[in-house]
């Protein structure tokens, strides 16, 4: 009997607390709402003065979310005064609880919007909401990147698949197995970009001789290209290239038994030395420009050249410091005696056509984030590559 009375009393206390809480909430929303809005608006206004580069703020806790996709409501668009900030805050309290702000440097006015925050794997939903609300972009907080509502990135997201061009012949950056499965450092880079976009990924075969034409083809066969593509001024004249995600430089592969023969380019630049290269890429260009006296042979399939060198059908392969260690570690007949003294110094990046600035911004944002959070270094370690950033 005593236990039942105790439980009844506890239920009554709980009920009274709930009723009291609802009454207080009602009083706050009806009687004190303007005081609350004013207090929050004052805090947001002060916060904005210290953050001229823009922000997204959870006004319920006055905290800054580090992840999410921020999109503004049309109802609060164009609010740029302390008085209008009250309207924005009131709208935010009635909806999602987020306020975004940014300084228009052209007119010196700070603009505020009630904002919805989407999970970062819901970019398609965020872009649709933005389009329905007459917005021009969505902002990915973790990447600090704007995604235009209308653009190439939006097209990829709507399609649901990222199309990536790659030669598939460049271990360990991009290689296609006979089964059709692609693997490699560059492949994992693009998988991360696709994950950030919330889409699937499909690889499209290209080749070194046709790479530039394939990137520039109309209609496009893929969105951009990866896999051992060195950043050069010549490529940037006609196409866009991302920031570098891998250091690179020209070196050689030779038979291990001959490794003492080759100490410099001069040792290779002789008629009796047969140098083999793949066609159409920078390896062939380097050989033609720097080894005029050597006997240069062109072989169509890049991935077959190391074995041909090991078998004696060529003496030297012009390759890169990203590729050479893979073959040396997997074939004891081969050596890379000048690996620590590359003939050139450069970086590898993502190649795309001009006009896709939104794609370039997105790719660069992912690369920057991977450098910042250590995932790019871990990917280097996985493939035995030297991290130089």
List the predicted regions and their residue ranges.
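Acidic, polar ligand-binding/catalytic clefts
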Residues: 187, 191, 195, 200-267, ...
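A ligand-binding cleft/hinge motif common to bilobed small-molecule-binding domains
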Residues: 210-213, 228-236, 285-289, 310-344
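Periplasmic-binding protein-like
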Residues: 246-254, 321-368, 386-389
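Ligand-binding clefts/hinges and TM-proximal coupling segments of bilobed small-molecule sensing domains
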Residues: 152, 282-297, 335-340, 367-389
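Short glycine-rich His-centered loop
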Residues: 159-184
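C-terminal motif of bacterial Sec signal peptides marking the signal peptidase cleavage site
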Residues: 24-27
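Alpha-to-beta junction loops
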Residues: 163, 198-200, 217-227, 272-274, ...
